[in-house]
Each structure stands twice: as structure tokens, then as C-alpha cells.
Amino acid sequence: MSEDHTKADNLSEKDPHSPERSDSSSHEDAHAREEEESSDDDGALDGKPASLIAIVMIALSLIGLQLAVFLSALDTTIVTVALPAISAHFNSTAAYTWVGSAYLLANAASTPIWGKLADIFGRKPMLLLANALFMIGSLVCALSINVGMLITARAIQGAAGGGLLTLVDTIIGDLFSLRTRGTYLGMIGGVWAIACALGPIVGGAFTSSVTWRWCFYINLPIDGLAFGIIFFFLKLKTPKTPILEGFAAIDWAGSFFIIGGTLMFLFGLQYGGITFPWDSATVICLLVFGVVCIVLFGLVEWKFARFPIIPLRLFQYRNNCGALLVAFFHSFVFTSAFYYLPLYFQAVKGATPILAGVYILPAVLSTGVSAAATGAFIGNTGNYLIPMYFGMSMMILGYGLLINFDAGSGWAKLIIYQLIAGIGNGPNFQAPLVALQTKIKQSDIATGTATFNFVRNIATAISVVAGQVLYQNQLKKMTSTLQQLGPAASLIAAGDAGANTQAINALPTPQRDLARSAIADALSPMWIMYTAFAAAGLFCILLVSKTELTTTHEVTEVGLEAQKKAEAERKAERQAKDLEKAQKS
């Protein structure tokens, strides 16, 4: 897109967050007004001051939203230290890979759909649906009698989890002004970071003390509480969209191509070099057809979709592309710490599952604190660029230091390096989302947020696969050295060290030390890769522009009629631009 065209877009389209477009001077008033318009029964609240009602409802709603995000994030990592026990229970090393990957793959593939569903049917109904699906998936996981049943249930969890995070971020964007939402998005980011980091600790505690099934049972009461709070206290206007008409408006072709393309591409990465050689027909076909489907998805969104899942107009600004790239690289790097640090502590340091979770507490605490502090900083200053630069710089330093983790690393090094990496993790959970929302209309908040989280989820899934591939391929290069381990050599050389940590700990001391050193050496190139990706993310921040965050609020219209109205407005804008160009020529 040319620079002149971009300027024309900027001139013809007012800042969607400008005071002239604001419908309210405070989010409390907007929230109270939505209560009046909502189909929910608010009669029990009559007679109370509106401002007090708004404050109470917002506080309770935020608790419910944070619980929903906590669940989605917790299940991203809770199984990481439980995977060896799950693999042993089902006598399946494949479970070590697929129980974790099924959640991430489904999470990534489903995310774009939730944003458009929320636009058509409303935020609250879709959030409740995601909660219900997550509860069903959790129950089936806990009751699984074979690995196939468990993997399928994890996929259901993943699809629902993608909706939980996307819809919560969207609702925050609906309720608060740009300046204010930075604080609340920071809170959500802090909850997400802490839950991701607590996952291995909670999973390790259940695996060691009770059973791995409690990694899924624990979701049921939390999910039930979140569902109840959201149902009774989150007051949002729900459109009365006819079910059949609403489903007819969904971009089914785009949904098919984005889900199919995402899954095929990620399956190709998952299989490559492990299950099948990289040059095998299976891997090549999956990768090629996955890319083809994604290209076809772009074509459908551009030319055919009336209500696109990922509208291409989101990418017309350099700022938006930069924010999405920063989100991609941040997620790619952040994910590695909470997937592979537990592996390091179990396989190299000989820790039990619960201790592996405890040993990553320095990264847990520093990540959560820095994420929440970033939200407060953005809310107070309106500046989101400083946290982005600071966070990525600290990630480069922190993950670069992790390269030095070896079998003999002392506790001072293990703690300090994790603290630095964790401080770098926090700032870019939500700062790029704030940057993205400065250049999109309020009517595009849901699709923009869904696109943002889709990019993050794709990065997470690719990160886990890329780390596994690099780690396992490094171990294969050490086959001759590992032959000294006897029967255990084949397990480690095949990349199954994570699923066989107990076998490694049972080796005689000389062989055990050799195995642990080999695993640490295999992890080192992986940290080099993640450090390089953090550096790439730092450069991408240069694409992000500085925009003043407004303190005014605009109420988001949802429903099929609102979608039609927004589309008509965009069509009128395009026609006005074309007419202006014709007059100039």
C-alpha cells in the first residue's frame, strides 16, 4: 500500500478514539447505560446510586473475567510437569507431545472465530459458551480412559480457552477508554502470566501428591465460579440476533481455510524430523497445503467475505503490523521458559515434578509483577512504547543468560537469570494490544483483539514445536556419546528424555551425569534461538507509532444489524475516497 493511500486513509477516517466520537466521559457511565439496555434483569439493583452500582458491577465482573483468563492460561502449562506421569500411565510416549500440543493447536486455530461470533451474537453469550465448553473438556480430560480420549478433550479445552482470553480482552476494550484499559489489560496480562507460570507448580503438586487427573478436576469449581459471576454480574447489551440469520452471516469459507491451514501447518512442524523426516511426503504436503489454505483464507477475506474474520483493513497501518509482530516474537520467546525450564530442572537437575515447578518461581513472580506494573504505568502515563522497548531488551538479556545453564549451574545463577528473564516477559503481554487498538475503530475491537490473540497463539504453538525439534535434533547428533548409557541411550537420543526423566535419575552416577550434561548441552542452542527471536521483536517495535491515549469512552454496538451498519459506513468511506481520487485526477 502506498504512502499516499495510507495518508488518505488517515485523513478520511477520524481517530476512532477521539473525543468527538465519544459517547461517554467515563466507563462507569457507559457500563451503567449498558445495564439499562441489557436484557438481563437488573430489578434487584433498583434504588441504589448508579455510580455505586457501576463500581460494584465492574469489580465483580473483573473478578469473573480474571478467573476465566486464569483458567485458559493455567491449562496452557499445567500439564508440562505432569506429562511424564501421563505418558507412563497410558504407556505412550506420544502422549508427551500431543497432550500439550492438542491444547495449543486447537487454541490457535479457533481464536479468530470467537471475535466474529462475539460481534454477531454478543460478548456475554459467547463468553458463557466458551466457559461451558471449557468445563466439558476439563471433565472429559479428568475421566479419560485412553490417550485418544485425553487428546480429544484437550483439543476441546484449547478451542474454548482461545475464546476465553479473546473475549475477555474484547470486553475490557468495550468497557474502558484507551487510557484506562491499559491498567485493566495489564491486570489481565499479570493474571495470564502468573497462571501460565503457576501451571507447572500446580501440576507438579497434583502429580506428586494425588494424581495427574486433578490437573483437570481443579478447573471445574473455578470454571463454575467464573460462569456464575459472569452470568449474574457482567451486564452487557446482548443483541437479539436470530440464530439462523446469525450463522448465515458467519464467514464459513474463511473459517474453514484458517482452521484447516493452521492445523495442517502446525501438524507439519510437529511431525517434521521426529515422526517423519523433513523431506517426507507427509511433512511436505502438510506444510505446503497449510500455507496454500492460509493464502486462500486471505483471498476469501479480501474478495468474498461480507463480514471477514480477520479483515485486511487491520493491516493498513504500519503501527498495527508492528504491534502484531511484537506480539508474535514475545509469545514465541515467553512460551519457552514455562515449557522448557521445567524440563531442565527435571532432566538436568533431577527435580521432582513439584520441585520443578517451585524452581521456576523466580520467573513466575517477576513476570506477574512486571506485567501488572506495566498496566499501571500505561494507565498513569499513557505511554506504551517505553514498556515495549524495556521488556524486549530485558528478554534479550535474560534469555541470553539462560544459554549458560548447564548441569553444574549454581542457585545464584539459576535464580538471578530467571528474574531477569521474567522482568522482560511482563511488559509485552498487553502493551502491543494497546498499541494495536489505537489504530482500529471501536467496531473492530473484537476482530482486532481476536487477530492479536491468534498471532500470539500461533507463536506459542510454533515455539513449542520449534523448541522440541531443535532440542531433539541436537540429542540425535550426540548418539555416539550417548552410547555409553546403554539401553537409556536410545530413549535420550530419540528425544524422549522429558518422558523418561525417572529412567535418567535411576542411572548409575557416572552415566546419570553424562545424560544430564548431554541434555543441558542440547537445550543450549534452543535458548540461542529464543534470544535471537527476542532481538527480532525489539527491532519490530520501531514500526509502532506513538499515539496519545484518550480518556473518553465509546460504546461498542454489537449484533448483526450493527455489523451491517458498520459495513455500510466502510463502503461509504471507500466510495468517498474513490470520488476524491477521481476528482484529483
From Swiss-Prot:
Pfam families: MFS_1 (PF07690). PROSITE patterns: MFS. Glycans are attached at N10, N91. It is found in: Cell membrane; Vacuole membrane. InterPro entries: MFS (IPR011701), MFS_dom (IPR020846), MFS_trans_sf (IPR036259). Its main location: membrane. Belongs to the major facilitator superfamily. TCR/Tet family. This is Efflux pump dotC. It comes from Dothistroma septosporum (Red band needle blight fungus). The gene is dotC.
